[in-house]
Amino acid sequence: MEPSGKEDHNCPPQDSGQEEIDYKQLLEEYYQPLQACENKCWCKKCCFHCMLCFQKKGLGIRYHVYRKRVPGTNKKIPGSGEEAIRRAIDLSFHRTASRTYTANGQTTEKKKATA
């Protein structure tokens, strides 16, 4: 997002003249612990004005990525709990009902009557 010709972002106004750089002050600011920065502007000056903004805006680093919840994902899984046990029992009953066992332990399949 580039700002238009108008001042539509909340940056402090830039001086037209060159400012004298104080390296000690820059190093002190650099080594300070990261603090919350509420600057919403994405211009070049605001992206590089502090270490936190540089990491967030310049490099795109996010330490707390919040997942978007998809509606309906908290539904019960149909294969869990008592339903799965009931299905397993029903399936095993249907398997054994279609077979007959002989005295020597062999199984034979029953044939369905066709009309």
Curated annotation (Swiss-Prot):
A Gene Ontology molecular function term of the record: RNA binding
Matches recorded under Pfam families: Tat
Record localization: Host nucleus, Host nucleolus
Cellular component per GO, a single term: host cell nucleolus
Region listing for Core, in residue ranges: 54-64
Motif window: Nuclear localization signal, and RNA-binding (TAR): 65-73
UniProt entry keywords in alphabetical sequence: Activator, Host nucleus, Host-virus interaction, RNA-binding, Transcription, Transcription regulation
Sequence segments annotated as region (Cysteine-rich): 37-53
Effect of C37S: Loss of binding to cyclin T
InterPro entries in the record: IV_Tat (IPR001831), Tat_dom_sf (IPR036963)
An example Gene Ontology biological process: positive regulation of viral transcription
Self-association and partners: Interacts with host CCNT1. Associates with the P-TEFb complex composed at least of Tat, P-TEFb (CDK9 and CCNT1), TAR RNA, RNA Pol II. Interacts with CCNT2; the resulting complex is unable to bind to TAR RNA.
Family, per entry: Belongs to the lentiviruses Tat family.
Function of the molecule: Transcriptional activator that increases RNA Pol II processivity, thereby increasing the level of full-length viral transcripts. Recognizes a hairpin structure at the 5'-LTR of the nascent viral mRNAs referred to as the transactivation responsive RNA element (TAR) and recruits the cyclin T1-CDK9 complex (P-TEFb complex) that will in turn hyperphosphorylate the RNA polymerase II to allow efficient elongation. The CDK9 component of P-TEFb and other Tat-activated kinases hyperphosphorylate the C-terminus of RNA Pol II that becomes stabilized and much more processive.
Name of this protein: Protein Tat
Species this protein is from: Simian immunodeficiency virus (isolate GB1) (SIV-mnd)
